[in-house]
């Protein structure tokens, strides 16, 4: 079981850490396991009864300190059950699995679309130089997610680049046909130095 909270209001991470420290202490002393970043936190519980008790304890503390809980982000549930997962710090936790939150993945894809827009006149080398730091940083944070995310993301990036190359060569279409895959195979982009999030995941797993 878990209880997910978000304190309503604008608090800087430093201010939130100072202000909410006493809540951390109170919950820990009550036997609860708390994971918190700024004003966003999760309490891990062993039963529904324990989760409800934790919620009541937090509600009492928040009211006593002149704060309020975010109504849409405060809830209890069994994250071991399908459909009852929760999102925290860009990840989604459900049924014992960690996946990238849909909103986080969509935000990255928007950046990639902008960097690989078909009207961009830069060389493939320059575009890859722009992409790689973004992909490395994103992977560094989300490397604990499920591997299929990285496979699909690699495919999305290569399709975007094939479409751009087709446009630069004044070929019709969007670079999604089998002929384009043969003309610019996955190995071609690896040779150009494109960072592969899936290959990075495989290497990270091997180094454990």
Predicted regions and their residues:
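Non-catalytic terminal/accessory segments
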Residues: 1-208
């Amino acid at each position: 079981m878990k209880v997910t909270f978000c304190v309503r209001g604008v608090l800087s991470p430093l201010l939130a850490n100072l202000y909410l420290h006493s809540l951390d202490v109170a919950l820990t002393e009550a036997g609860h396991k708390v994971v918190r970043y700024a004003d966003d936190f999760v309490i891990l519980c062993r039963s529904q009864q324990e989760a409800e008790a934790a919620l009541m304890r937090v509600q009492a503390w928040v009211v006593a300190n002149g704060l309020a809980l975010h109504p849409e982000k405060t809830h209890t549930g069994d994250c071991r059950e399908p459909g009852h997962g929760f999102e925290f710090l860009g990840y989604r936790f459900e049924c014992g699995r960690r996946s990238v939150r849909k909103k986080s993945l969509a935000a990255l894809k928007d950046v990639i679309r902008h960097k690989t827009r078909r009207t961009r006149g830069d060389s493939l080398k320059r575009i890859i130089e722009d992409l790689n730091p973004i992909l490395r940083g994103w992977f560094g944070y989300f490397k604990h997610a499920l591997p299929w995310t990285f496979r699909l993301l690699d495919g999305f990036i290569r399709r975007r680049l094939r479409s751009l190359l087709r446009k630069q060569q004044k070929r019709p279409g969007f670079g999604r046909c089998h002929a384009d895959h043969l003309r610019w195979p996955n190995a071609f982009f690896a040779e150009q130095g494109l960072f592969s999030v899936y290959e990075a995941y495989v290497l990270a797993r091997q180094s454990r």
